[in-house]
Amino acid sequence: MAPYLFAADSNKKRALALYRWSVELGASVQETLGITEVFVRNAMNDQLQEWNRRETGNPSWLLDAPASPLRGLTQGKRREALRRAQKSAGNRSIHHPRYGDEITHDDALANTMFGMWKDILPNHDPDVVPEKRENKNRVRMWEEALEAAFPYAVDPDGHTTYWRVSHLHLLCNRVSHMDSLLNVDVLDVIGDAFSLVGSIDAVLEQWLTGTRIVKKIYSSRPQ
């Protein structure tokens, strides 16, 4: 409660009101980020499946080890997604329509984490070393596959897309850990979510902005 008490000048009633506001804001942010993540992973996955099909003849880059350099960029996180998908399948009720079925590519895809998608993109952090092999591999994947996932962005080196995804990933982690949003420019980051989705499909962006309640809750911050 420390950040809320500080913001409320040690007034416990105001601090609790701020805490409740932050929780409600976090829930609305999480909803928007969750939808955005689905759109982003589906768009990137479509291009990665096509790329892996060209490289290996097998479109699934999740169920089996993909071609290099995608293999090295995703190896640990890909295996973790498979493990979670297999665990989920093993927990299916006998009455589940897919009881006993093998996991599919889509099962594994649904169990990927947002951080994996950021890690595949060209790294534009200020202290990045472009000559490192993994960074060259990220650039290669962008040029050969992932740039096409964002057809409405003029982003030849992936700089804009990387920072949009990075900002969303940071906010996603903050919200999932129930960290304070008191000093976070939530509307700016949510704007990145809308722009990112718009770079995939303008219709999806219009739909997403129509569902937003983040701005309404953000504006209702207790004084």
Regions found by a protein language model. Give the residues of each.
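Amphipathic alpha-helical interface elements
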Residues: 1-171, 177-187, 191-223
